[in-house]
Each structure stands twice: as structure tokens, then as C-alpha cells.
């Protein structure tokens, strides 16, 4: 299984266009040792030719341009994208579908809840019908694994996760299973197994057991502290209120990952305020000490 990190930042990317927090300002003036990052998206393949796109970020055009296999050049119009899986209906995970309209129809897998959001509050399915029929919806059943024809060796198993639906969702304040999912992706040929959850608000014992059965966990790294945005003066909401489990503190993501000594552990969906973006920070050093990696744009994982 080939896993390509197309984008590793949370919504807004890094540096965020309108932000002058310590991280963003420091990156711009050259005082911060950090890498720029686009908004979270990954691609997965069983052969390195046909790819399943997991989330379509607003930065999708630049992300595809930076990864040569996404343009195999087999025809006058071509793409390496064979299917698209949406983990949720958030703007930073779905807006890229608009930029992919020239390639419609696209095969899109998502849950009933995500399809409802993207047919009402943010009606991408309706809008894109005008381009060669738009998006062909393939329903993700929460209790069933599924395969994608172009990558037959990969088995995808959805996992309903505790998180929050976006502000435009009809059930913003009435959470439903399927608002947000994680994925277990298993390569039936190599036996490699990936746990992928860029939006993760809580890890209970059953979920931890599933994570322990994976070779690599690629998980929510949005915030270091739950009140990080408040501390940085750029927001009023906590990580938990937005459906993200912070790394630091009792019950935080680092405590969770500490229970997975055998797995490769990688944080993704990093918010622009997170001090781990600073490669010289004590927080980054703590991750190194704990053998936890920070995803970056262009990172490749083979399982």
C-alpha cells in the first residue's frame, strides 16, 4: 500500500492567509524553522498508478501538481484519481471537489450524513451535476467494509468517530453516527494496515484496540493544547468543541499514542497555531522523544 500525504495542515493551511500568530508571522519573517503546509488530504494506492483520494482540500490543484503520479499522461485528458472518499463534510475536506469538476463524473464514497450535508447546507452534489453528471454517490455503510474497483487489493472499513458536523449541517447540534468517520485501510496483498482519522475527538477502549491492530496510525494532530486558540488570541473555541483531541494533557493524544509502542505514529491535520510546527520547539522535541512523527506535504508511507 502506498500512502501519499498531499496536505498535512488543518483548515486554512500553514501559514494561514489572514493570521499573524507567532507561528504564521515567524514563518513569514524567517524566524521560525518550519515547513509550509497545505490543507489535509491523502491519496492511497495498491499499485502506485490508480489512486483513491481521501478528502478533497481547497488546495487540491497544487497538491496534484506536486505529485507526479496524479497525472499519468495516458490520454489527452487524464488523472490518477480513480475514486474519492470523504471522511466528513467539512469545507476544508470537500471544497476541492469544485476544482475537480472538469474530470466529472467522479466516483465518491461517503456516508448518508455527509451526503445530506453536501446536498443541503453545502450542496456540492447538486452544484456539480452540471458537469457531466457530477458526482456518483457510493454509500458508505457504517457496518460494512468496501472496495474500490480501481484498487482491488485495498479493503476500506469505516469507523464512526466522535466529532462535530460543520456549521452548515442540518444536524450541527444533533450529532449522528456518520458525521465523521475514520478508516481502516488494509492491503490484502501485503497485509499492511493503516488507521486514518484526521478528525478525532475521543479515543475509547474499543477504538484503541482497533488502532493497536494497525501498522501505522495517521491521526488528528490539530492542537497541542485544548485551549490553544484562546491562548494564541485567535479564537474562542476549544479543540474538544470542534471535535479534536489535543495532544497535550491528561487523556490527550500523546497518552493514547503512548499505548501503541509497536505502531508507526504520525500526526496530520496540524493547525497553524500548534507549536509542533516549529521544528525547534520543546513540543516538537517531546514528539521526537515519544517516537511520534509530524506529517508534511509530500510525505510517503509504504505498508
UniProtKB/Swiss-Prot annotation:
The keyword Transport applies. Belongs to the PqqB family. Keywords: PQQ biosynthesis, Transport. It holds the Pfam family Lactamase_B_2. The keyword Magnesium does not apply. NCBIfam families: PQQ_syn_pqqB. May be involved in the transport of PQQ or its precursor to the periplasm. InterPro entries: Metallo-B-lactamas, PQQ_synth_PqqB, RibonucZ/Hydroxyglut_hydro. Pathway: Cofactor biosynthesis; pyrroloquinoline quinone biosynthesis. Coiled coil: none annotated. This is Coenzyme PQQ synthesis protein B. GO terms for biological process: pyrroloquinoline quinone biosynthetic process.
Amino acid at each position: 500500500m502506498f500512502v501519499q500525504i498531499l496536505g498535512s495542515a488543518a483548515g486554512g493551511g500553514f501559514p494561514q492567509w489572514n493570521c499573524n500568530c507567532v507561528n504564521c508571522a515567524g514563518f513569514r519573517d524567517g524566524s521560525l524553522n518550519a515547513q509550509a503546509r497545505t490543507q489535509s488530504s491523502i491519496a492511497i494506492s495498491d499499485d502506485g498508478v490508480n489512486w483513491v483520494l481521501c478528502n478533497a482540500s481547497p488546495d487540491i490543484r497544487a497538491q496534484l501538481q506536486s505529485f507526479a503520479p496524479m497525472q499519468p499522461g495516458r490520454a489527452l485528458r487524464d488523472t490518477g484519481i480513480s475514486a474519492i472518499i470523504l471522511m466528513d463534510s467539512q469545507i476544508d475536506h470537500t471544497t476541492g471537489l469544485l476544482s475537480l469538476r472538469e474530470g466529472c463524473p467522479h466516483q465518491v464514497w461517503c456516508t448518508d450524513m455527509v451526503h445530506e450535508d453536501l446536498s443541503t447546507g453545502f450542496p456540492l452534489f447538486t452544484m456539480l451535476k452540471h458537469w457531466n453528471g457530477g458526482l456518483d454517490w457510493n454509500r458508505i455503510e457504517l457496518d460494512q467494509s468496501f472496495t474500490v474497483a480501481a484498487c482491488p487489493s485495498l479493503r476500506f472499513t469505516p469507523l464512526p468517530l466522535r466529532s462535530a458536523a460543520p456549521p452548515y449541517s442540518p444536524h450541527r447540534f444533533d450529532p449522528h453516527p456518520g458525521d465523521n468517520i475514520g478508516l481502516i485501510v488494509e492491503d490484502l496483498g501485503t497485509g499492511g494496515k493503516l488507521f486514518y482519522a484526521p478528525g478525532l475527538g475521543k479515543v475509547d477502549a474499543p477504538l484503541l484496540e482497533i488502532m493497536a491492530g494497525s501498522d501505522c496510525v495517521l491521526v488528528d494532530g490539530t492542537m497541542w493544547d485544548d485551549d490553544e486558540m484562546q491562548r494564541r488570541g485567535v479564537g474562542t473555541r476549544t479543540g474538544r468543541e470542534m471535535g479534536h483531541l489535543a495532544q497535550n494533557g491528561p487523556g490527550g493524544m500523546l497518552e493514547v499514542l503512548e499505548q501503541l509502542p509497536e505502531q508507526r505514529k504520525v500526526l496530520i491535520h496540524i493547525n497553524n497555531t500548534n507549536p509542533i510546527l516549529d521544528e525547534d520547539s520543546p513540543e516538537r522535541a517531546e514528539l521526537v522523544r515519544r517516537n511520534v512523527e509530524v506529517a508534511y506535504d509530500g510525505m510517503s508511507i509504504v505498508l
